[in-house]
């Protein structure tokens, strides 16, 4: 892709998300979503092949449907309130429809089916944008309408997302699909605490973006897209591969890595709000995510996949790819929690 065109597309993506996050007018928010969607589609088709075309088409159809639901919710709210600006108390019907629209844009269950398929069909760099930046705008809208959100609906969707994010990743060997299901589960954790403590949702989002960005950058550095290709990297890049596996365990929420912090704080907050049953179910279901990450770590580090005897060994050479920011990102994604014990005192 022409660098000038790429810069223009990236600026449009950033502008669309910024309009959504900074506007107080519903029509401007809808326009921001549309700008963002139309600019992201060329990024998804950066590698021009049938799979990326299919992924971009699925993404467009899903996001267009969500935008129609968003406009329907805006019109219903306009009929009841008589104004285009944000109101703290939305009409219940409009609130439910808007929650469903944002859930479809984010990939919350049961509106999640497009996330693994689209992520698998695009490049790693496009997948990074899809699973990190594209979550900001829908979550900002949910953050604003959180005082009037339907509690039963959002908790049901969050519990389903955590369960499906765990079950879906169990039989996957494609790393992009594993990260897509992990994203669905993390979105479920964020949605579960949204009605009780929206600020904690932002903390969870920050840590999720940090860990996912580091994981994608490590995959881009090793050019790994499957479990098999990751296991063959031990000879070529041992340090990078071990860092990748450590960050995957952090994504799964293994203490004392930083991925454990948001889960710990969310369970604590849910318990304070007398949602003990939900917190218990979420904690048990989160073990599914941790299981497939630990299985992936075990398979790539302690065992050898069945391969042909005449397969060429990957020798270790100096890596030509620039990785200036990776050491800092790896440190932040793994040992932030042990280095900052004061975080555990936050209420």
Swiss-Prot record:
Keyword check for Membrane: yes
Record's subcellular location: Mitochondrion inner membrane
Catalytic activity: a ubiquinone + NADH + 5 H(+)(in) = a ubiquinol + NAD(+) + 4 H(+)(out)
One Gene Ontology term of the molecular function aspect: NADH dehydrogenase (ubiquinone) activity
Entry-linked InterPro entries: Complex_I_Subunit_2, NADH_DH_su2_C, NADH_UbQ_OxRdtase_chain2, ND/Mrp_TM
UniProt entry keywords in alphabetical sequence: Electron transport, Membrane, Mitochondrion, Mitochondrion inner membrane, NAD, Respiratory chain, Translocase, Transmembrane, Transmembrane helix, Transport, Ubiquinone
Record PANTHER family: NADH-UBIQUINONE OXIDOREDUCTASE CHAIN 2 (PTHR46552:SF1)
Similarity comment: family membership: Belongs to the complex I subunit 2 family.
Protein name per the record: NADH-ubiquinone oxidoreductase chain 2
């Amino acid at each position: 892709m022409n660098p000038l065109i790429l810069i223009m597309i990236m600026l449009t993506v950033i502008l669309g998300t910024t309009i959504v996050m900074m506007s107080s007018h519903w029509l401007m928010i809808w326009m921001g979503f549309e700008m963002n969607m139309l600019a992201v589609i060329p990024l998804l088709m950066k590698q021009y092949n049938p799979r990326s075309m299919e992924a971009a088409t699925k993404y467009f159809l899903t996001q267009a449907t969500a935008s129609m639901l968003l406009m329907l919710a805006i019109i219903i709210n306009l009929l009841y309130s008589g104004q285009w600006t944000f109101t703290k108390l939305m009409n219940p019907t409009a609130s439910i429809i808007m929650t469903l629209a944002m859930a479809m844009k984010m990939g919350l269950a049961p509106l999640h089916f497009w996330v693994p398929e689209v992520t698998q069909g695009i490049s790693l760099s496009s997948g990074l944008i899809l699973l990190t930046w594209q979550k900001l705008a829908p979550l900002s809208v949910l953050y604003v309408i959180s005082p009037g959100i339907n509690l039963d609906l959002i908790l049901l969707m969050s519990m389903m997302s955590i369960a499906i994010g765990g079950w879906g990743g169990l039989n996957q060997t494609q790393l992009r699909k594993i990260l897509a299901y992990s994203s669905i589960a993390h979105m479920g954790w964020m949605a579960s605490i949204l009605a009780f403590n929206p600020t904690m949702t932002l903390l969870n989002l920050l840590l999720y973006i940090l860990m996912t960005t580091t994981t994608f950058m490590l995959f881009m550095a090793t050019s790994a897209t499957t479990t098999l290709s990751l296991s063959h990297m031990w000879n070529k890049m041992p340090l990078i591969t071990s860092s990748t596996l450590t960050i995957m365990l952090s994504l799964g929420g293994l203490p004392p890595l930083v991925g454990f912090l948001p889960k710990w704080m969310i369970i604590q907050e849910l318990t304070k709000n007398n949602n003990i049953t939900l917190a218990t179910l979420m904690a048990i279901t989160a073990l599914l995510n941790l299981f497939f990450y630990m299985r992936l770590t075990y398979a790539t580090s302690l065992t050898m996949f069945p391969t042909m005897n005449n397969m060429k060994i990957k020798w270790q050479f100096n890596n030509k790819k620039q990785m200036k920011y990776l050491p800092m990102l790896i440190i932040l994604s793994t040992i932030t929690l042990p280095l900052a014990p004061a975080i555990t005192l936050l209420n």
